[in-house]
Amino acid sequence: MRVLGIETSCDETAAAIVERDDMGEGRILSNVVLSQIAEHEPYGGVVPEIAARAHVEALDRLVDRALNDAGLKLYEVDAVAATAGPGLIGGLIVGLMTAKALAMAAQKPFYAVNHLEGHALTARLTDGLPFPYLLLLVSGGHTQMVLVRGIGDYERLGTTIDDALGEAFDKTAKLLGLPYPGGPAVERMALQGDQKRFALPRPLKGEARLDFSFSGLKTAVRQTATELVPLTDQDVTDICASFQAAVADTLSDRVGRSLERFKTEFPDCATPSLVVAGGVAANKTLRAALENLCTRHGFAFIAPPLNLCTDNAAMIAWAGAERAATQAPDSLDIAPRSRWPLDEKSAPVFGTGRRGAKA
């Protein structure tokens, strides 16, 4: 089965075609992504109106390019899939309406995909990973620990009770006068810094619950920077290194407890695995810390290629293909959802968490 996927949930416009065979193995035929960093950089963050307009301007030609790169015509794909949420509502509307129109014109089945499910299933595309496994999703809009039991069967073990990790990176960068996007900027500066200079907090470390918290760490960074004004270059690099070390320790504590819980629930699992996805998963220091953690616990550490960790349409096409193998198509009447939890059975987190894109 060949599926055309479309992703427009935030500030990347993307189209891709993925093939899934009868054995459940996947192959990416094309994967086109257009970033909007240049459009949003002057504002220090994503502006929803600008993002939606940029999607409108770019999406048609990206779909054409994805088809051309795959050597296919629209009528030769077997289904169309698009992100229906969560995300910025303007961008979701652009992608969803385009995908519906293409599906209707070509008389192909349509699948509305949860963006988080795309991240959750990427390791099955890249590594053929069997169920069950653990997913750590770390991005600008999410920080979640998820147990993936099967297609559509997800249990949220932990989530952020305030800021997403990617947002904490971006806010730290902004406090220190670093360029947008903040995550890569903080990582670059941290390489030159002393991570032991500042004793920043490790929120919720040692607690039994598996939730995350980063607002206190962000506040500590602000207080530290304020006390040092005017900041020297060495101050900035040391704050970045100390911040990144605190994040690595916090993730290791939360994830370590999740690995122990997984082994208790699935003692006979032959291939216990931790998958890390989302834009923050591109951070090499955090990857190394989590990989070492997995080695100590006897887990395989799986991080998709960097271009598949950040937002892309290949993961959306693949999620559509996985669902198409066992589920009926979605109605063309389906509406976009700016908020759409992957695990709809778990109690929602009220009054906390990111209030913005893909919250």
From Swiss-Prot:
Binds 1 Fe(2+) ion per subunit. Fe cation binds at H115, H119, D311. Belongs to the KAE1 / TsaD family. It comes from the Bacteria. Its EC number is 2.3.1.234. GO terms for molecular function: iron ion binding; N(6)-L-threonylcarbamoyladenine synthase activity. It is an enzyme of class 2 (transferase). Its main location: cytoplasm. HAMAP family: TsaD. Residues 328-359 are annotated as: Disordered. InterPro entries: ATPase_NBD (IPR043129), Gcp-like_dom (IPR000905), KAE1/TsaD (IPR017861), TsaD (IPR022450). Keywords: Acyltransferase, Cytoplasm, Iron, Metal-binding, Transferase, tRNA processing. This is tRNA N6-adenosine threonylcarbamoyltransferase. It comes from Brucella melitensis biotype 2 (strain ATCC 23457). One of its GO terms (biological process) is tRNA threonylcarbamoyladenosine modification. Its cofactor is Fe(2+). NCBIfam families: gcp_kae1 (TIGR00329), T6A_TsaD_YgjD (TIGR03723). It is found in: Cytoplasm.
